[in-house]
Amino acid sequence: MLEIKSIPAFNDNYIWLIQNSDQRCAVVDPGDAKPVLHYIEQHQLTLEAILITHHHNDHIGGVADLVRAFPNVNVVGPKAEPIPTLTHPVEDGDRLELFDETFLVLGLGGHTLGHIGYVGDGKLFCGDVLFSAGCGRIFEGTAQQMFDSLNKLLALPEETEVFCAHEYTASNVAFALAVEPDNELLHQYRDTVNRLRAQNLPTIPTTLRQEKWINPFLRYLQPSVIHSVSSRTKNSDPLSVFTALREWKNEF
């Protein structure tokens, strides 16, 4: 079983550190090297791998400095994106071994065209595709691509832990409550999120099981969600509902 630690960066990023039992580690989406190097030094770890989900600078900005500090580190990331530091370009369906665990690479286009995720050991590192109670903005891809990516994640086991890259949960819950004001589980989750954030504690990881109950972008089949977007789209098919939700969230 791998141990996961969150390293906060910038205003709301999480860099995830994956550690095994013999002081070796990997990090996911290190937008800033400084807090990573501080943590590694403090805990006397050796950095063996960097996993990248997509090319945005708040996810890769620290990679070059980490490579300078650990010249033999493996840098894994999306083959389809312009990331010059990669040593191991990967794509959908590839597998990688990390500390005796096998991780599957998932193609998750939408936020960016080449965005990928990594799932293994019951853990999903999904970058900016799925957030707790939300999903990523569609910068390069299409609504269809993001919709397909989220459905790919929905097919994973419900107990899968979700490690996304940002602490957006409180604002996402506010939007989710605008969509489903009568969702009692959402009200309970809002209270939990508020308690955690008041103590400066992360709301992540979440689980796919929880997200199925509280995330409007995964609940496009629910009558309450369809009703909420009925003034924004003439159609009630899943993709139209999802697209209307994403456009609503953009302006929320």
From Swiss-Prot:
Q: Cofactors per UniProt?
A: Zn(2+)
Q: Where is Zn(2+) 2 annotated to bind? A: 58-59, 128, 166
* Role this protein plays: Thiolesterase that catalyzes the hydrolysis of S-D-lactoyl-glutathione to form glutathione and D-lactic acid.
Give its E.C. classification number: 3.1.2.6
Protein name, UniProt field: Hydroxyacylglutathione hydrolase 2
Keywords, alphabetical: Hydrolase, Metal-binding, Zinc
Pfam families in the cross-refs: HAGH_C, Lactamase_B
According to its UniProt record, this protein's enzyme class is hydrolase
Q: Does Lyase show up as a keyword for this record?
A: no
List the CDD domains: hydroxyacylglutathione_hydrolase_MBL-fold
Per the record, the gene is gloB2
Record-listed Zn(2+) 1 binding positions: 54, 56, 111, 128
Taxonomic lineage: Bacteria, Pseudomonadati, Pseudomonadota, Gammaproteobacteria, Vibrionales
Query: Which reaction is recorded as catalysed by this protein?
Result: an S-(2-hydroxyacyl)glutathione + H2O = a 2-hydroxy carboxylate + glutathione + H(+)
Organism of derivation = Vibrio vulnificus (strain YJ016)
Q: What is the cofactor note?
A: Binds 2 Zn(2+) ions per subunit.
Give the range the annotation lists for the signal sequence.
none
Cross-referenced InterPro entries: Clx_II_MBL (IPR035680), Glyoxalase_II_hydrolase (IPR050110), HAGH_C (IPR032282), Hydroxyacylglutathione_Hdrlase (IPR017782), Metallo-B-lactamas (IPR001279), RibonucZ/Hydroxyglut_hydro (IPR036866)
